[in-house]
């Protein structure tokens, strides 16, 4: 381990074009699940100047009014623009894939893939500190706009936080970058003062900056033209924002717009749930869990646990306990994590793993999991 390193994570507001597309896709999914808990949805969204395209596969009892969903979501994100077209290119799920995932009891995975989950003891919600701080900045930036604390803010915005680690522990914040769209007549010096007071200082209460922390606010200067009027958005383009800020591995599969039979989503959520419970149980200071699946197969083809030399037990024993304790089939993950409920649009902004009330963030089973590990350790004569 290096004596000193700098780790960085970023976040975006709900009005960022890519994240707006994610929200639309997950709202479509939620609307399908409201009427049909067994709906199969794979929804992609493209946003560009004057047009939204919603494409993908949906097999459900009721297909929602997708054009209305797009317009309502754009409005809720804070945009006033109404003059845009919505093109809907939706068709049913492939019958081959439908057959592979049809049996509700032993439903196979909807695709192959490897998903990673991560947790560490750095913060209250067991996420890396740069990730937590970046999301706090963008959430407070949006709050400052919607609550009227800062006038002239617009929906688009981004934040980035760099934290200096010494021997693996966070020591200080080395740099903060905050970019926010604003009205043309907004005074930039006033904007900086307001952002420091209402966004940056409150966001850093859990881990304050020091006098040497570099703070960059709109470092490119004016940021008047932004959002969907200036940039093209697409679902699945903010994978590191959604997960661990690039501080943990990622298998490459996006989360939003996919029902629970897609292991890109259910597997990623379950891997996070497992890693979080391992750390919450005091069995490791940090933990990475990997799950790999084959299309049409219910059980994972690989399960891996890595506690980065911080584990109470061997990684092999923890892997054995994971296989015994958690139902890792798609049907099991859907049931355990309540993935047939319309909960996704609320989860897709400011990180999928930042809200303690979400099913995959629960740690109520940590104690029982620790008991199982102790039993396995006693039975095999030691970890």
Task: State the predicted function of each range.
Residues 39-43, 157-163, 213-217, 283-294:
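A short glycine-rich, hydrophobically flanked beta-strand micro-motif that places a catalytic Asp/Glu
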Residues 8, 50, 68, 75, ...:
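Glycine-rich, mobile lid/loop segments that gate access to catalytic sites or pores
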């Amino acid at each position: 381990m290096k004596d000193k390193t700098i780790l960085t994570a970023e976040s975006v507001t709900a009005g960022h074009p890519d994240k707006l597309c994610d929200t639309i896709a997950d709202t479509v999914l939620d609307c399908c699940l409201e009427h049909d808990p067994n709906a199969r949805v794979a929804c992609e969204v493209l946003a560009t100047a004057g047009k939204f395209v919603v494409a993908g596969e949906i097999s459900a009892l009721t297909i929602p009014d997708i054009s209305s969903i797009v317009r309502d979501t754009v409005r809720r994100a804070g945009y006033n623009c109404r003059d845009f077209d919505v093109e809907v290119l939706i068709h049913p799920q492939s019958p081959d894939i439908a057959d592979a995932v049809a049996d509700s009891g032993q439903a196979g995975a909807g695709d192959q893939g490897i998903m990673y989950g991560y947790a560490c003891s750095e913060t209250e919600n067991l996420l890396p500190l740069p990730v937590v701080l970046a999301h706090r900045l963008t959430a407070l930036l949006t709050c400052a706009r919607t609550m009227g604390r800062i006038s002239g803010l617009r929906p688009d915005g981004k934040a980035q936080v760099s934290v200096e680690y010494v021997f693996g522990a966070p020591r200080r914040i080395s740099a903060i970058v905050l970019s926010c769209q604003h009205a043309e007549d907004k005074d930039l010096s006033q904007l900086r003062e307001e952002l420091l007071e209402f966004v940056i200082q409150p966001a850093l209460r859990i881990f304050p900056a020091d006098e040497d922390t570099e703070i960059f606010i709109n470092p490119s200067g004016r940021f008047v033209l932004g959002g969907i009027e200036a940039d093209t958005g697409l679902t699945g383009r903010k994978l590191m924002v959604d997960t661990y800020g690039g501080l943990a591995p990622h298998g490459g599969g996006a989360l939003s717009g996919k029902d629970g039979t897609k292991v890109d989503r259910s597997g990623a959520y379950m891997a996070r749930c497992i890693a979080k419970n391992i750390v919450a149980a005091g069995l490791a200071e940090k933990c990475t869990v990997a799950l790999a699946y084959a299309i049409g197969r219910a059980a994972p083809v690989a399960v891996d646990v890595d506690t980065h030399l911080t584990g109470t037990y061997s990684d092999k024993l923890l892997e054995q306990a994971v296989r015994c304790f958690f139902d890792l089939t798609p049907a099991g993950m859907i049931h355990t994590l309540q993935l047939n409920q319309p909960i996704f649009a609320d989860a897709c902004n400011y990180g999928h793993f930042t809200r303690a009330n979400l099913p995959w963030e629960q740690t109520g089973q940590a104690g029982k999991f620790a008991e199982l590990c102790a039993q396995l350790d006693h039975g095999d004569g030691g970890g």
